[in-house]
Amino acid sequence: MTEPRHESGSAAPQRPATDPVQRQVNLLRDQKRNLDKQAAALASQNEKLVRLLNASRQEIVGLKKTLAAEAEPPATYAVVLQVNHGRRPVGEATGDGPVVTGPTLDVLAAGRRMRVAVSPLVSFGACEPGLGVLLNENYVVVALLEYERTGEVATVKEVVDHDRVLTVGRSDEERVLLLSGRLRRERPKPGDAVTVDHRTGFALEPVTRTDVEQLVLEEVPDVSYTDIGGLGPQIEAIRDAVELPHVHPEIFREHGLRPPKGILLYGPPGNGKTLIAKAVARSLAERSAAKAGRSRPEGYFLNIKGPELLDKYVGETERQIRSIFANAREQAARGVPVVVFFDEMDSLFRVRGSGLSSDVETTIVPQLLTEIDGVEQLDNVMVVGATNREDMIDPAVLRPGRLDVKIRIDRPDREGAREIFSLYLTPDLPLRDEDVARAGSRALAAEELVAAAVQRMYAREPETEFLTIGYRNGTSETLYFSDYASGAVIRNVVDRAKKQAIKTLLTTGRRGITAEHLVAAVDEEFHEQQDLPDTEDSEDWARLTGRRGDTIDSVHMASHRPQGEPGPGATP
């Protein structure tokens, strides 16, 4: 074979065995052999891991079955007293590091206090004091239950610390109880009712006292001063007492004058005392909203009906009064005005030692005085009382500094009755077409109806005489039905006229309220009132007339138509 030659004619040199390309090839072959060995080793390890994983899975399934079997009945009921997170036991040697115990629970089971372990199937984070749990035969917690749903109810008197409260239970027994996990989150306040378990020493859950809540809380009433008729001077006096301190607080501070803390509205029944109290609440809310730049008035009207607070158990009425004022303080602390309105105030706060009742007022009156005096530093709380027996209220309640402003709400006169009738007889009611045509407009026709009703109600005629009062000085006075008129009576008269108009429409087909309907309604209303009150006691009549009973010597009823005879009134 002819060897290749160079151009010069000499033979080509041989390539050495250590050529770089050959070395690279050999290196790659070595790496491949190593990778093959590693792959084989990994495959072997993977097979071992698969076998181990399958074995572990089977073992876990077996353990779960074992744990589940431990939770099967029979089991012991217990209550969690304390949750113990993992920590180093006190007095134990530390060695190379801290010795830590696992999470445990202190429980009370069958009267025994024990420290027990918690099953892995139970969420330890959900364990909290007061909660019910189940223990298996090895005293391991295997299930979480709920709080005891029954038990005695006690009232929180004082919060001792973050996990204890002082409660008052039956027979005024005071006990310090631990708070359950739920109550520790909700933070009970003095006056709150809670269920208690004296066996474990826990206050468990809050209880809503609907007997108090349903009596008191109401948003801003939708009653304004314009909705009240016939009480112009009284409303003006109330607005001066209530609104001026809020509209011009700097002037009052300059003169060293404090706003009044309370108002007493007294006078005959049915003349708008409750409406005035609601209007006061709305007025305060509107003034407060304007001052704070809020578009929507915000406030609260706590309407307390006196007789509903009375309770046969000693101390229960006082507790409810404390709860009411605590509610008022809580709302006032938000910067909104609160009106606490006591209707029928004489039923709660009678003169102490009068002997006219069971003397429960000996403790109720001091409780109210304490609460009113406590309102002194709250600018947003106003106490309003209403009564038609102001002479029966304890003088300590009425003194200046408590109920500062006292306003008598009298029966309406002729002009006042016209204003009240105008609130109920409005042009949008069904009116007779001929009456509207004769008057010229619906508004004028409604005014004519008002005039007819007022004329009949305030007529001084023999048939409208109600009774004759003889005084001890020898004089006498004849009272007419109009002397017993009130806003409630006027509204009832209008309602009677509306019912008569409906009956006329159903029987004759003629639509609309007429003056004849109103006149007949006035007569029927007053004749029904003729025998009320059914008494010869001058004290009762003095209360209705506004005269003092000690000046009245005799009362003689006027003689009118027999009871049950149809009232006068033209046929519509």
From Swiss-Prot:
Residues 1-22, 527-572 are annotated as: Disordered. Pfam families: AAA, Prot_ATP_ID_OB_C, Prot_ATP_ID_OB_N. Keywords: ATP-binding, Coiled coil, Nucleotide-binding. GO terms for molecular function: ATP binding; ATP hydrolysis activity. Residues 21-67 form a coiled coil. ATP binds at residues 270-275. GO terms for cellular component: proteasome complex. GO terms for biological process: modification-dependent protein catabolic process; proteasomal protein catabolic process. PROSITE patterns: AAA (PS00674). InterPro entries: AAA+_ATPase (IPR003593), AAA_ATPase_domain (IPR050168), ATPase_AAA_core (IPR003959), ATPase_AAA_CS (IPR003960), NA-bd_OB-fold (IPR012340), P-loop_NTPase (IPR027417), Prot_ATP_ID_OB_2nd (IPR032501), Prot_ATP_ID_OB_N (IPR041626). HAMAP family: ARC_ATPase. Belongs to the AAA ATPase family. PANTHER family: AAA-FAMILY ATPASE, PROTEASOME-ASSOCIATED ATPASE. This is AAA ATPase forming ring-shaped complexes.
